[in-house]
Amino acid sequence: MSTEEKSLNFIEQIIEDSLASGFPQDKLRFRFPPEPNGYLHIGHAKSICLNFGLGLRYNAPVNLRFDDTNPAKEEQEYVDAIKEDLQWLGFNWAEERYASDYFQQLYDWAVVMIKNGKAYIDSQSSSAMAIQKGTPTQPGVDGPFRNRSVAENLTLFEGMKNGDFEEGTHVLRAKIDMSSKNMLMRDPLMYRVLHRHHHRTGNDWKIYPMYDFAHGQSDYIEQISHSICTLEFVMHRELYNWFLDQIYDTTKVRPNQYEFARLNLNYTVMSKRKLLQLVQDKVVNGWDDPRMPTISGLRRRGYTAKSIRNFCETIGVAKRENVIDVSLLDFCLREDLNKTAPRVMAVLDPVKLVITNYPEGKEEWLEAENNQEDESAGFRKVPFSRELYIEREDFLEVAPAKFFRLSIGNEVRLKNGYIIKAESVTKDLEGNITQIEASYDTDSLSGSGTEASKRKVAGTLHWVSVSHAIEAEVRLYDRLFIDEAPDAHKEKNFLDFMNKTSLEIVNGFVEPSLINVKVNDKFQFQRLGYFTVDKESSTSKLVFNKTVGLKDAWEEKGKKEENLLMNMLKEINKYVKEKDENTAKNTLIPIIENIKSIDNYSLVINTIVKNIKNDNNALLFANLILKHSDKVIAKDIEIDHLTKLYSMSLKSQLASVRILAINNLKNDSENFSNFQTQLAELKNSEKNSNVLE
């Protein structure tokens, strides 16, 4: 811990209260219980850091327990991946346990519960049970098999265990209270028949316990003191305690369940089902695709374990759900890599630069600092020659006033090298620049101390010597989704929000010091961002993944789009006031083009809703967005908001608002008929020929 004492989170306070009440510290025990049906993702990292962090804080053991109670979805591949991820994150577990280790004990307890009249075999169909269970506002009713005799229940349960029945014919249910306000207490399932091969127990078992029965009992077997879950299990706590009541021995530690808010990240999907869909549909290239929020995907992209741990510590532990900006995760990564990643030069979109007054055949090895944030990182030598590669975007023949890069007649400094001035260009038959000719100031070598070296110029460019450059494949990764909440829109498939430019592969050049890089080595490509050597890289073909940019491009883009929308409303005010028809049309054209350029679905929807008010200009803006944005259609807007928009717009004093509302209604067949009365009234009262038309 740091010298500055941090305040306790509410889970830590609960533990402190337990200790203060006399609970022995040597009895503290925690666990991390993943189901091996997928890869761990960044959401799991919060729970991992919490549980293992508690273990470190209180010097208490933390078990890794695999909740392997559903052989239909679980595989050894996932077990191995989870263990690898935990170790990579820097955590070691006390014992490796499996719920399947306890199958016999769980079965024996179930038999005892049957004998005690606390469980019974139900032979209804799942649909019949669902009806019989009632609703949140209506109590359930007893099923026809609830009062089976103990003897019949034991015989049927034994038959289920022996594989005498098909899947779905019988289940074991706890006998609790069919009128409970908590629907989970209305005789929940304990066991079901599954004729599936289990990755550890093979075909030994034909019945498998349900999560709610296995989880708390496993905690009890392992003597877990504090069972920490996410908030969706709040309603399960009553059932957790009821099951423990059936087996609890007062001489042992009784586990208690506590809940905290899970991690929700914007621009991210963390449902295992949806992540699996991305993999199976080949939207991504496997679970460790660098665009995935899985721990293995983040690791491959170049995230460090330290940055993820720092991120989890920064967001803290809370009782209320909230959405964390993924930019914070990137910030934690930049903060770590800035201190540790060596600086190197790479050119991703090269154009040749020839220094015409530099002697042919000459080369110099210039000194370059590896990391100005770390004095111990030292220096390296970088070759400089007559022919160099620079980024194509770093040159313009004729540059605007605030272009701080290279242009004809202007000077820039080459990083660690000389000041150059662009003199001319060579173009191909299509007019594309193939070469830039420049001259250099022989006395301007960086760090030489000469007057020329101290001269201020427009900017500093990175470069690579042509004769020494090493080819490399560079994979430019970006966010997988373009919307803040891709799986939160009822009328939309989360795949509708895929970022079509989430991966761009380019072939560039890197400096020769990178010839012997190893997988997972991390670098800052100066002026470009942080990059990591991919697992597919080899000595014959270097492959780098873009890990994160030097700045948050999405934040800049988001602000730009928000500012664009604000400015559009100002332009609409001009449009409405303009008397000249041609000038008005010319004002409207860029407004429509700007509407089409907005990618953020949530921003578009929110802007429409925000402008549904008794203001003609605002209504005009909302209707323009609905008509011209290719990101939304009418049914994407909540019906109450949409109805209000149409109703207010048809009554607007501005003919242009009424016209747009009618056009939008024509494209909205589901709602068009609902406004026939208002449209008929317009026909009778409207004086504007355009509206009537």
Role assignments for model-derived ranges:
Residues K6-E16, A20-K83, H199-T230:
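N-terminal catalytic cores of NTP/NDP-binding nucleotidyl/phosphoryl-transfer enzymes
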Residues D68-N70, Q76, Y98, V112-K274, ...:
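Active-site cores that bind ATP or allylic diphosphates and position pyrophosphate for catalysis
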Residues Y78-Y102, A110, G117-A119:
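A glycine-rich helix N-cap at a beta->alpha junction
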Residues F311-K319, V323-M568:
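Substrate/cofactor-recognition hotspot
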Residues N586, P590, L603, T607, ...:
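Alpha-solenoid helical repeat scaffolds
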Residues I592-E593, N623-D630, N663-K666:
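Structural signature of alpha-helical solenoid repeat scaffolds
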